[in-house]
Regions:
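Conserved thiamine diphosphate
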Residues: 2-5, 11-60, 96
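Thiamine diphosphate
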Residues: 7, 16-26, 59-181
Length: 181
């Protein structure tokens, strides 16, 4: 069954809606889903990423997929047309540093907007900061090493931001990076 295309759409993916109470704050679910062999877990940040994730799930006939969606209203971050499906690579640079890059925020879902705001605040202080949206670990891990290194360079502080447990993010942030969940 792990080699059959089936698509699961899940909602309420984080703690963003506190008024629903503690039973609606699934901090461990994303990690648990990512631990399932051959399952592609997508956590898009906006409407464009959601459409691209859906297209990836439809084309991927050899495994099941999960789209973990937020219930809260989120800003539209992708406003320029891209010539390709950026989610298909698992991660991509959403925002390039204006000053010399010293920090890379790596985020998923609703936290991508938070990472963009934090990057803007750092840039205002003269600290260059990229924002990498990483809607799908599994697809990113399948990319060539040079692509992965281009997004997560060794000379920058890598900071992951996801509303969930941080276990697993160290593979991307390294031991010197920071993980916020």
């Amino acid at each position: 069954i792990q080699h059959v295309r089936s698509i699961f759409v899940l909602t309420h993916d984080s703690i963003g809606l506190g008024e629903d109470g503690p039973t609606h704050q699934p901090v461990e679910h994303l990690l648990s889903l990512r631990a399932i062999p051959n399952l592609a877990v997508y956590r898009p940040c906006d409407v464009v990423e959601t459409a691209e994730a859906w297209a990836c799930a439809l084309e991927d006939a050899g495994r099941p997929s999960v789209l973990a969606l937020s219930r809260q209203n989120l800003p539209q971050l992708r406003v320029e047309a891209a010539p390709e499906n950026l989610v298909a690579r698992g991660a991509y640079r959403l925002r390039r540093a204006a000053a010399p890059r010293r920090v890379v925020f790596l985020a998923t879902g609703s936290e991508v907007a938070i990472a963009c705001d934090a990057a803007a605040a750092l840039e205002a202080e003269g600290i260059g900061c990229d924002v990498v949206s990483m809607p799908c670990w599994e697809r990113f891990d399948a990319q060539p090493a040079d692509y992965r290194a281009g997004l997560l360079p060794g000379d920058a502080l890598i900071v992951s931001v996801e509303a969930g447990v941080t276990l697993g993010w160290e593979r991307y942030t390294g031991s010197a990076g920071l993980r916020f969940g």
